[in-house]
């Protein structure tokens, strides 16, 4: 009962923040979102391979992408599914692009993603969405589910490191976000085995973040569309 109450409060706060987002400033976002280890982002940027930033529909995921945009001098693009209502899509896109964040439609513009990484930029993506049934199967919260392997493929092809980060809502209404580096130095080359293993690592690390504050995760109703419990998973 308490869990549902906390979750409803979290959903309501996220919705209100989305409505208020046109009024945010760069300084306001830095005040709302404190990144605990910005030095990790800065260290990885020195490699000049670009960065793949994965978040989840957790806390205020819209602020997560905005925060990494205002905290970094590098170009940032985010992969998003277009809204079915064109007017709503234009409004949300305008809000998201206020501080230089570039929206790339899901499923297209692979060249734009590669260009961003080659220029040392950041590609942001929500990593907790339900993937097509033909995707790699990974265990997530004890269920075998298809998971997007795109981040792993881009990372293995370009050498861009993957980091995870979720905005965790605090009692005062502000957020903290801590980056976690997904290790991949031991994975040499693009192969089915390496793609599966790197996907498995980021999925399991995302689960670990969610477990710390499960009431702030918004996507549980859509993550298990294609459960394959009888299928062997990583």
Model-derived regions: residue spans:
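Catalytic core of membrane glycerolipid acyltransferases/transacylases, capturing the structured
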Residues: 47-107, 130-136
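Residues in well-ordered beta-strands of folded domains
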Residues: 36, 79, 180
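Membrane-anchoring hydrophobic helices of lipid-metabolizing enzymes
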Residues: 1-55, 92-94
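Short capping/connector residues at structural and topological boundaries
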Residues: 29, 34, 38-40, 63-66, ...
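Short, flexible loop segments at the rims of nucleotide/cofactor-binding pockets, characterized by
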Residues: 28-33, 81, 98-104, 142, ...
């Amino acid at each position: 009962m308490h869990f549902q109450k906390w979750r409803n409060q979290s959903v309501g706060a996220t919705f209100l923040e989305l409505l208020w987002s046109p009024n945010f400033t760069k300084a306001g976002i830095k005040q709302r979102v404190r990144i605990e280890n910005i030095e990790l982002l800065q260290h990885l940027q020195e490699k000049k391979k670009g960065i793949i930033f994965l978040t989840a529909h957790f806390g205020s995921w819209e602020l997560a992408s905005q925060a990494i945009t205002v905290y970094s001098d590098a170009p940032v693009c985010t992969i998003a599914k277009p809204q079915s209502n064109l007017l709503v899509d234009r409004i949300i896109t305008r809000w998201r692009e206020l501080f230089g964040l570039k929206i790339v439609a899901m499923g297209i513009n692979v060249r734009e993603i590669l260009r961003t990484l080659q220029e040392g930029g950041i590609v942001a993506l929500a990593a907790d969405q339900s993937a097509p049934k033909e995707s790699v199967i990974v265990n997530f919260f004890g269920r075998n589910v298809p998971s997007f392997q795109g981040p792993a493929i881009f990372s293995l092809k370009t050498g861009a490191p993957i980091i995870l980060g979720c905005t965790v809502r605090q009692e005062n209404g502000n957020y903290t976000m801590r980056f976690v580096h997904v290790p991949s130095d031991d994975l040499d080359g693009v192969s089915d085995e390496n793609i599966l293993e790197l996907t498995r690592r980021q999925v399991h690390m995302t689960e670990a973040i969610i477990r710390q504050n499960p009431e702030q995760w918004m996507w549980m109703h859509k993550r298990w569309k294609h459960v394959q419990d009888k299928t062997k998973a990583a």
